[in-house]
Amino acid sequence: MGGEFDATNVILPPEAAIICNIGLDHTEVLGDTLEKIAATKSGIIKPGCDAVIYRETPSVEAVIEARCKEVGAKLHKADFADIRLISHDLTGQVFDWERFHALKLPLLGDHQLHNAAVALTAATVMQQRGWHITDE
């Protein structure tokens, strides 16, 4: 489900926490507003890690920003403006994002491009932390 209830909380210390699109899912556990869900999901952000997030509404981002400030985590927001769709058909879509070109995504929809941008942002952050991740 994510956040403070996520099974990955056993990994200490995490180097990165990734929060994708926050919606009104699992409200009986996570909370009944987007802001409450953001607070619960931001429980995965631990001291000293990098937090990578899907662009959200200002009120949701404020909750996540507060958690990052509280624990000393650096916040990175995926930049959707840098997504350039090259082509799409029934097999998926091809896009450019920042320094990455002609990436093939076998899923359709803008939300899938946004999820890919979050994943690429996380990979870039991990490269900056010294992880060997090639651009391929």
Where are the language model's segments positioned?
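Acidic, Mg2+-coordinating active-site environments of NTP-dependent enzymes
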Residues: 14-99, 116, 120-136
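Intrinsic-disorder/low-complexity coil detector
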Residues: 12-13, 105
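A short glycine-threonine-serine/GTX helix/turn-capping micro-motif
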Residues: 104-112
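Switch II (G3) loop of P-loop NTPases
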Residues: 1-4
